[in-house]
């Protein structure tokens, strides 16, 4: 009788612990479920990440991060040529003296009428891309 009670209690404890070990990464992962039907322009993208089926997502995908942080990531098929070209372009460091597409520094006068102040988000030093791995 004592063995039966111990076995039941052990089974209950095990059953309660299993869901916590499966979700111990801090929550579920956002997965792309279908690909965008339109080509995504370089001018609206700031970076990307890869989605692998081996990590629990249903399809392989490239998730492009839009420049506007309030917008959702854009999913694309990693086998399409335009997707590979866009990834290559994002991986390249910007040419010296070139600004990112979203930077408006030195494009005339600001609202206050002062020149040369630069605009929010524009860096005066050379920008570097974070390494992808």
Curated annotation (Swiss-Prot):
Residues 86-133 are annotated as: Disordered. It is found in: Secreted. SMART domains: SCY (SM00199). One of its GO terms (biological process) is positive regulation of T cell chemotaxis. Residues 104-122 have a biased composition (Basic residues). Its main location: secreted. Keywords: Chemotaxis, Cytokine, Disulfide bond, Inflammatory response, Secreted, Signal. InterPro entries: Chemokine_b/g/d (IPR039809), Chemokine_IL8-like_dom (IPR001811), Interleukin_8-like_sf (IPR036048). GO terms for molecular function: CCR7 chemokine receptor binding; chemokine activity. Disulfide bonds join 31-57, 32-75, 103-122. Residues 98-133 are annotated as: C-terminal basic extension. GO terms for cellular component: extracellular space. Inhibits hemopoiesis and stimulates chemotaxis. Chemotactic in vitro for thymocytes and activated T-cells, but not for B-cells, macrophages, or neutrophils. Potent mesangial cell chemoattractant. Shows preferential activity towards naive T-cells. May play a role in mediating homing of lymphocytes to secondary lymphoid organs. Three genes code for Ccl21 in mouse. Ccl21b and Ccl21c produce identical proteins while the protein produced by Ccl21a differs at only one position. Ccl21b and Ccl21c have 'Leu-65' (6Ckine-Leu) while Ccl21a has Ser-65 (6Ckine-Ser). Binds to CCR7 and to CXCR3. Interacts with PDPN; relocalizes PDPN to the basolateral membrane. Interacts with GPR174. This is C-C motif chemokine 21a. It comes from Mus musculus (Mouse). The lineage of its organism: Eukaryota, Metazoa, Chordata, Craniata, Vertebrata.
